[in-house]
Structures are given as C-alpha cells and as structure tokens.
Amino acid sequence: MAEFTYNPVQLVLAGQNVILNTTISCPKGYVLHRNESGLVILRGIVNNPQSCFARYQVTFNGNIAVPEDGTAGEISVALAIDGEPLQTSKAIVTPTVVDAYFNVTSTAFITVPKGCCFTIAVENTSASATPTTPAPAINVQNANLVVERVA
C-alpha cells in the first residue's frame, strides 16, 4: 500500500493534476512517486510467473471548491491513466457560492499488464459552462491518494 497527500490549499487549473507531496511509499517498489509531482507510477510486476497482470485499487479523497475569484458552478476531478481521465471515476459537485468546499471521493480498479507501467494522477476535469469561457480552475485541499495492490 502507498499513500500520497497534500494538505494545504492548492489552485489546480483545468486539465492539470493535483500535486502530492507527502509520501508513504510502497516498500516493494510496485508504486513510484516523486515528491511535488502529481504523477504516480503503477508497475506491472507479478509475483506469480503464471500471472498476466497486477491489479491496484486507487482511491482519491479531497475537498474541492471554486476559488474566490471564480464563478460558482459545476466542478469536477477524476483519476487519469496515462493522461486520460477515467470518466467512471469522475467526482462532480455544483457549488452555489465560491470558496465553499465539498468532499469528493473516487475509486477505480486499475489492471496493469505484466511488464508494463501506467501513470496515474488526479486531474481537474471541470468543463466550461459556455464555449466562450475558459474551464474553471479549482481549489483542492486535504488531497489524499491511496494505492493498494489487490492482485
């Protein structure tokens, strides 16, 4: 098991990753992370030579809000695999005022083929309300990503 956290408030632009800086690393080297990065690498190391994959349960929990200089509206985060948001992991909230924090949780099982590596992250997937306005940035506080090897 590995755990990555970042407790202070951080501003995350649309399409960018949540930064993680405190690490409780995996002692076997299955999960890798560089501090002050939002990227975590899952390795497809197998203990049984007959196995074709390694499976991980990845869970993100954190508080998200629209920043004070933003406009209240729908915001979201999702787990991303190799830069692509996993839509089934998207956590969506709709604050009616700015700087109002909502707790969100997202979990996914990720299967890594033997000998491969996947890069995972937590991404701001908030979309623009109209085609002419940019997608909103979000504040993230108490970010916590837990990776557990399950098979």
What are these regions (language model features)?
Residues 1-151:
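Extracellular jelly-roll beta-sandwich "head" domains, especially the C-terminal globular C1q domain
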